[in-house]
Amino acid sequence: MGSDKENTPEMLSCIFRASHAIILLVLIGLGEGSQHGDNSSQAVSMASHMGQQYKESQCHRLLSDLRNGARVIVHLPSNIEGHWVSTSCEVRPGPEFITRSYKFYRNGSFEARQFYYRDNHCTSPVYTLVIRGKIQLRQASWIIRGATEGEYLIQHIQAVCHSQRTADQLGQLLNCTCQGPQRSWEPGLGYELLSEQTGCDCSLGLNLTMNELQLLRLEKVYLHHGHVVEQLFLGDVHTDPTQRMYHRPSSFQAALQNAKNHEQACVACRIIARSGELRPPVLPPRADLAVALQGQWASLRCEVRPQGLFLKRHFIFHDNNHTWEGYYYHYMDPGCEQPTFSLYARGRYTHGLQSEKVMGGTEFVFKVNHMRVTPMELFTVSLLNIFDGNECGEQGSWQLGVEQDVTATNGCVALGIRLPHTEYELFRMEQDARGRFLLYNGQRPGDGSSPDTPQKRATSYQEPLVRCRASSPGGHREAGDQVPRHSGGSGQWLGLANVAVTLLVTLLTLQPC
């Protein structure tokens, strides 16, 4: 991290320690935005810095208007009463293939059905868990703007197996039910695993938690033709199954949609909404698409990362020479309107084999050997300028809105970036109901590290990118070329600098500096 100047205030030292703890997220899943507030007048105008060749590109238009003209309203406090369902087959760390059907009632009770599958398209159900309990919504989250914190109590868990093979496996794993000893489990029957009334709990072997209910965000999307889509985001699941029970969410899973107000093209929504534990949803079979990275890919929405970090991503892949370029735009707000910093990275990649661990996934190895950073607000400029030594570009030379190459200094110590860097990635592709190609890459490790060994390769995915251009421009961007900007701001690693302020609050409340 480097030592602070002797006259650096002790509090600023805490900021640096806090920022270093969170800024270690590198490469494809890079980074996060930040919580540090800033006046919009301090942000550099993105349009004035936009590269000419990107002005009219479809990718730029997509990144400039992620909502595609729709009006999005976040409701606080969140009224989550209703029936909420998955929009597709979800992949959780492990991996686990799952669909969800959650009902929340006016009296604070909930009934959650989690359907588990043998395959990555959710066509072969193996068992269903029915979880009943109570939830109480608390204050607005201080980690993620627009989110609400919640507390929950599980009162009842029931399991239903959908094959004899699964019944035998679960029966051996749990070795008890609340009805007393069972000789053997049978498919199609419900087995009580937890009962608040009797004090029985046979569910520990499932490693089940509903900590996702500790963080919620409700959005209403008003589309052009008057249709309203309601989306409920629940807290993320830790990538390490051994940490799942203790994890308090700081980002989100894929959104659930209201069973009455979902996207009209959502086939999975309709199937899941009318399913139950005795008749689990079976989604339409689909073929796995071969992962073809060639072209340009961009974020579909303002993405949320752990600790309330926000960003947009734009990747360019060159299949002819297996090189890649990445633009990361970081923000301090969940609408991606207040920029903090941007980062440009490039390197090489190698195409691997089909994953033996994650059905439908393909393994890649990515190397990053070139990086440029552009601070987009004053706090980050100060953060970058205060470090001793030429370990993050030229010492003391950072200016607002001016890009600097950090390759010669082997990255940027201030931001926790080391070059060269290697990551072991997981990808999959699919086509949505509108015919668009979507690209998923591996979820970042929940402990804040990077997947720099094969053993740390992801078993689940981040939010998808959409192909916005089938071909890619020839060659890398050379020194002196403008970083493409997007209206509303551009930010990658800068948001992490702002996150330092939020983490400072944590440090000051948890331990002395």
Where are these regions (language model features)?
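Short, hydrophobic/proline-enriched secondary-structure or compact coil segments at domain edges
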Residues: 111-113, 150-152, 225-241, 322-327, ...
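Eukaryotic intrinsically disordered, low-complexity regulatory regions
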Residues: 54, 176-212, 219, 257-279, ...
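Broad, structure-driven detector of short, well-ordered beta-strand segments within folded domains
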Residues: 99-104, 133, 208-225, 309-318, ...
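N-terminal signal peptide
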Residues: 22-61, 67-76, 288, 483-486, ...
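N-terminal glycine/threonine-rich, aromatic-flanked beta-hairpin/loop signature
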Residues: 46-50, 55, 65-76, 80-83, ...
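Preference for solvent-exposed, low-hydrophobicity sequence contexts
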Residues: 6, 26-29, 499, 504
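C-terminal GPI-anchoring signal of eukaryotic secretory precursors
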Residues: 470-500
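Classical eukaryotic N-terminal signal peptides for Sec-dependent ER targeting/secretion
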Residues: 1-23, 492-497, 513
